[in-house]
C-alpha cells in the first residue's frame, strides 16, 4: 500500500487520509499510525513537491496535517489556512453543548442496553468503548439512536466504529470539502475510498460531495489503486478524447 500511495503522489495525485481519529495538538500520535509511510518518505528522500501532496484530515474535519519538507514529519496546518467559512462560524459553546448532550444520550443508551462502557471525551468528540465484548447490533442501536435524537447547532456525526460508538463535531463530508478547497480539487476529480457507508457509518455523508468507492478491506483498496495507476499511465501516451 505504501508503494501505491507514493506512486499516486508521483503522478501528481493528492492523497489524503480522512479519519475519525483526532489528537488535538499531538501530531506525534498521528505519526505513530503512519510510521512506515513516513519512514519510507525519508528513506527514498522524496522531494517536497511530492510529499506536499499527502495530508491527513483528522477528527472527521477538525484537524489538517501536512508533511514537513525536510524531516518528513507531520505538522498541523493552521486553521485559518484551510477551514471553510462555515467551520469558522462554529461557536465553541455550541460545540461543547453538542458534546454534552451526545454524552448524555450515550449514557442513557448504555444503561438501557445494560452494557458497561468506558467514556472518552476530547476537544471535538465524545464516545464509548465497551469494557467487555458486545455484539455489533448493540453498537448499531446506540449509533442510530444518537443520530436520530441528538439536536445541535453545529453539524455532527454519530457512528458505529465496529468496536465503539463516537460522536464528532462535523463529518467527513465537511472534511472532504475543506480538503478539496485547500488542494484545488474539483468534485469530479475526487474519489473517496471507505468501508463505512451504512446508515451508521461515518463515510456515508461523503456521497454528497464526490465519487465514492466502497471497499471491504485494504486488499480491495490496493486493487483499485493499481487500476487507477494503470489508467493514469495509459492516458499519458493515449489522451482521452470524447
Predicted features by range, described:
Residues 101-191:
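Conserved acidic, metal-coordinating active-site core of Asp-based
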Residues 3-115:
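Active-site phosphate-binding/coordination module
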Residues 22, 61, 130-133, 197:
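Short, glycine/serine-rich, charged loops/turns that create anion-binding
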Residues 19, 58, 130, 194, ...:
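Short beta-strand/turn micro-motifs composed of small residues
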Residues 166-168, 173-242:
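Mg2+-dependent phosphoryl-transfer enzymes with acidic/Ser/Thr/Gly-rich catalytic loops
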Residues 10-14, 154-156, 188, 209-210:
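A generic structural motif
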Residues 56, 62-66, 126, 163-167, ...:
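A short acidic, often aromatic-flanked loop/helix-cap motif at beta-alpha or helix-coil junctions
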Residues 24-27, 136, 221-223:
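Short, charged/polar "capping" segments at the starts of alpha-helices
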Amino acid at each position: 500500500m505504501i508503494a501505491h500511495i507514493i506512486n499516486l503522489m508521483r503522478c501528481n495525485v493528492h492523497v489524503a487520509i480522512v479519519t475519525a481519529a483526532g489528537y488535538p495538538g499531538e501530531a506525534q500520535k498521528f505519526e505513530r499510525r503512519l510510521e512506515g509511510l513516513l519512514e519510507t518518505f525519508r528513506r527514498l528522500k522524496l522531494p517536497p513537491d511530492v510529499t506536499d501532496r499527502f495530508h491527513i484530515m483528522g477528527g472527521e474535519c477538525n484537524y489538517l496535517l501536512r508533511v514537513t519538507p525536510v524531516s518528513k514529519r507531520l505538522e498541523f496546518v493552521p486553521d485559518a489556512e484551510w477551514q471553510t467559512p462555515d467551520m469558522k462560524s462554529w461557536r465553541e459553546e455550541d460545540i461543547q453543548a453538542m458534546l454534552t448532550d451526545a454524552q448524555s444520550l450515550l449514557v442513557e443508551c448504555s444503561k438501557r442496553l445494560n452494557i458497561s462502557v468506558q467514556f472518552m471525551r476530547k476537544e471535538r468528540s465524545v464516545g464509548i468503548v465497551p469494557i467487555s465484548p458486545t455484539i455489533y447490533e448493540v453498537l448499531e442501536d446506540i449509533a442510530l439512536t444518537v443520530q436520530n435524537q441528538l439536536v445541535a447547532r453545529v453539524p455532527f456525526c454519530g457512528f458505529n466504529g465496529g468496536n465503539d460508538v463516537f460522536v464528532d463535531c462535523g463529518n467527513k463530508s465537511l472534511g472532504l470539502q475543506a480538503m478539496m478547497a485547500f488542494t484545488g480539487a474539483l468534485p469530479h476529480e475526487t474519489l473517496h475510498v471507505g468501508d463505512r457507508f451504512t446508515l451508521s457509518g461515518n463515510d456515508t455523508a461523503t456521497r454528497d460531495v464526490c465519487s465514492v468507492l466502497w471497499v471491504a478491506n485494504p486488499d480491495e483498496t490496493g486493487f483499485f489503486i493499481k487500476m487507477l495507476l494503470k489508467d493514469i499511465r495509459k492516458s499519458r501516451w493515449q489522451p482521452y478524447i470524447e
